[in-house]
Amino acid sequence: MSEQVAKRFIEALDKLEGGRDLEGIVGLFAADAEVGNVVSPEKFRGREGAREFWGAKYRDTFGEVRSTFRNVFAAEGRAALEWATEGTANDGTPVRYDGVSILEIEGEEIKRFHAYFDAGSLGRQLTGKAQAQDG
């Protein structure tokens, strides 16, 4: 079951990134889900929290964005997804970062989602400071 939920998550993320279909990904989360990442100390709770996280905190951060998955590991009630995300900031600046997302799954729903990545690097790219510091 966990492998199928992970696959549906990847498909829904693709639709969110490519077509801004927010409801597809929100529908995968449990009513009492917890959603977050290393950038935000705030945890987003429930489906409304998932909607805010995946809309305002994720998709709206980018102009264009696309994630690819290198490894997907799923076991009973858990999945780990290794990914790379590329796209542009809203001002057109290129963005690339990679990380790992952990999904805790109950039945056919995601109970908890947390993503781990280099938040400093992503922040510099989104604010256009990466080239100044890297160069």
Kindly label every feature range from the protein language model.
Residues 1, 5, 46-49:
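Short amphipathic alpha-helical segments
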Residues 8-9, 50-53, 81:
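C-terminal ligand-sensing/allosteric alpha-helical core of TetR-family HTH transcriptional regulators
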Residues 12-16, 36, 87:
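Alpha-helix C-capping/helix-to-loop hinge sites
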Residues 2-28:
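Short acidic-aromatic low-complexity motifs
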Residues 22-77:
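A solvent-exposed, acidic/Ser-Thr-rich amphipathic alpha-helical stretch
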Residues 55-135:
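A beta-strand edge to alpha-helix "cap/lid" segment located at domain peripheries
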